[in-house]
Amino acid sequence: MALSATLKRAFFLAVVALSALVVVNATQAMQRPDAFKDAPRKFATSEVKPQVIHKRAGSKVQAAYFTNWGIYGANFQPTDIIPSTLTHIVYAFADVSPDTGSISLTDSYADEQKHFPGDSWDETGNNLYGCLKQMYLLKLKNRNLKVLLSIGGWTYSQSGHFNFVTDATKRATFVTSAVSMIENYGFDGIDIDFEYPTSDPLASGFASLLTSLRTAFDNLQKQKGDSVPYQLTAAVPAGSDNYAFLRVPAMNAALSYWNLMAYDYAGSWLTFTDNQANLYGGVRTNVSTDKAVKWYIANGASANKINMGIPLYGRAFEKTTGIGAAYTGIGPGTTEAGIYSYTALPLAGAQVFENLTDVTSYSFDSSKGELVSYDTPHIATIKAQYVQTNGLAGSMFWDLSTDKVGSDSLVVTTAGVYGSLDQTQNHINFPNSEWDNIRNNMGSSPSAPSSTAPAGSPTTTSAASAPTGGSGQCASVPAWSSGAIFTGGQQASYQGHLWTAKWWTEGDTPGGAAGVWTDNGAC
């Protein structure tokens, strides 16, 4: 049996290697550019007719990465964030020591020190400033906006930074460090962008790390008496080379969401031009978002935990005749070669093409032979509708500093398709923080969380308010309901059995594949 499984795995990996042209550097966009402090290069752009969004649906996740280097050259500040279009801000990036597993911030000035308008220069105490203070202020004013610290990314995944996951002692250090980061800086959880666990030991260690983090976060919630859990997410690849080793069932049990990096399917590593974020198709690269989504679900991921990544940038090819053709060069890009911010697209003189079969778009300047693969609002709309149709959690964006504003914004576009967004409350109570102003809520009373959901939102009840169901040991516990929220340790009756939630859950059926519930036996 063991030999057979090994041979099957070897055969699968051989097929992947022969059939796919995507290589391990396919998400290098999720890194800090070398010239991040320089102003982005400016390019003339073409006008595109804004798309009008009519469809509305149930509550969804809108998660977007905010980079701590974006405050420099891109001049994108925390005050530029539009909270009403987001449910999660993923703050990128922190680093991890491969020697110890300890987490560290990567830019003390941006993260902790920069003074923004309204910040005092002479207040007493040990106070937090920088972007992280601004994130906490956003949370106080928008009680349904969650902020997670992202650890890793392409840059901080290199040189064996995540090799620590194979060592139980270093994993334990990481977990302790993660809890400290949450408590000190007022985060709602942790996101891990490990690019990539491409071996059995790394994948197994990564799954073990996530399991330990989930346990620690649930314990933290219980210790503090919080009503909602601390969230754990992972940025995961869409290319089979990079997801083949993942321990999906174990990861799914630990994760709040999978942030699917559904982009960078094409770039300078290919010998031909292609779409970088096609929903379907992918005949030349053997990669598509739909294929990746189906793989994750088939291998144990819950559909309602998957956030589809949408790029807020384009990948360029020079001196080419079109999609699938050869090219020479990738152009200067906005902040790094070959990558143009969505704000700069389409480039002047280019015509925009949309393929509604594969659900892709690109601009092409035939006079220059310049092609840029990126998502238009229309394509983002179709992707959001796919999220709805397939019961996915929502959308994820890389990164906020490169989005447009108003009706051209892809974040605004998908929020408009979804209508109502996730209303899960954030955390503001951090009495153990090392920072005085985090401990005292910045000296002000926080805004109350939203008490009414937008039109079209499903009604959600807490487990405490749900009707009881059953007799015997089930007599005093609520009956399970798909619209009720249960936190770790709470019980429910379902189909004549008593069940105990392992962690926060909404809509996960007792006994289902998500593995959220423990069966305590018949009532």
Model regions and ranges:
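Glycan-binding loop/region signatures in secreted carbohydrate-active enzymes
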Residues: R32-G58, D99-W121, M135, I151, ...
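Active-site-proximal beta-strand/loop segments in catalytic clefts of secreted hydrolases
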Residues: A64-G70, Y91-V96, S150-W154, D193-P197, ...
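Tryptophan-rich substrate-binding surfaces of secreted polymer-degrading and adhesive proteins
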Residues: G456-S457, A463-C523
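Fungal secretory targeting signals
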Residues: M1-V48
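Substrate-binding surface in catalytic domains of secreted glycosidases
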Residues: A63-A64, T100-T124, Y196-L345
